[in-house]
Design a protein with these regions (language model features):
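Short Asp/Glu-rich motifs
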Residues: 44, 64, 95-96
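Di-metal (Zn2+ and/or Mg2+/Mn2+) metal-binding site signature of metallo-dependent hydrolases
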Residues: 52-73
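Activation segment
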Residues: 15, 35, 65-67, 85
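Short, ordered, surface-exposed loop/turn motifs in non-cytosolic proteins
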Residues: 18-22, 80, 173
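Divalent-metal coordination cores built from histidine and acidic residues
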Residues: 69-165
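Single conserved hydrophobic/aromatic residue that forms the stacking wall/gate
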Residues: 164-173
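Histidine-rich, glycine-flanked metal-binding segment
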Residues: 1-5, 11-55
Length: 173
């Protein structure tokens, strides 16, 4: 008996094949069977008249800060996203010298219009280097996978000192 069986869903498998009505078995959090006659589940979900798809990958997000405090990375997880990529647009929070935190928050706020107050309240800054940032992310519980690029703005601020850099203004952006 499977842990979960999703019954009679319109399965879109992501390969370009035609949509097929099938059942999906899940055991220990992993898909173990897709098809018909896959057996019973301890929990069964009727997906009749509903699409069932693989998780989506969002290749351009700005969860760099939010990923350090929000295990759901909402709202993306509510929309079927199972993997996010951040470090986009050159803005992010690692590497980060302790005296550059406010500057990096202002950069993210200015370029991406993410409220600086939310970032300042949420980010714990328990890293300085990029590998330490990855370690901090790894320790966080989360409902989706993450991938991150090294943001060039943070690298530049770390290497040259953020005090020599000018933040973009609303007029420039």
């Amino acid at each position: 008996m499977h842990d979960i069986v999703i019954r009679s869903g319109k399965v879109v498998d992501g390969t370009g094949k035609a949509i097929q009505q099938m059942d999906i078995a899940i055991d220990n959090g992993l898909i173990t069977a897709v098809g018909n006659d896959i057996g019973e589940g301890r929990t069964e979900i009727d997906a009749s008249n509903h699409l069932v798809t693989p998780g989506f990958v969002d290749v351009h997000t700005h969860y760099d800060g939010q990923a350090t405090w929000d295990p759901e990375m909402s709202p993306s997880s509510y929309h079927g996203v199972t993997t996010t990529v951040f470090g986009n647009c050159g803005v992010g929070f690692a590497p980060a010298q302790p005296d550059s935190h406010d500057w990096l928050i202002q950069l993210m706020e200015g370029v991406e219009d993410i409220p600086g107050a939310a970032l300042a309240e949420g980010i714990e800054w328990n890293w300085e280097t990029f590998p330490e940032y990855l370690d901090a992310l790894e320790k966080m519980p989360r409902v989706m996978d993450i991938a991150t690029q090294v943001p060039h703005g943070s690298v530049r601020a770390y290497a040259v000192s953020y005090t020599h850099l000018t933040l973009p203004t609303k007029r420039i952006v």
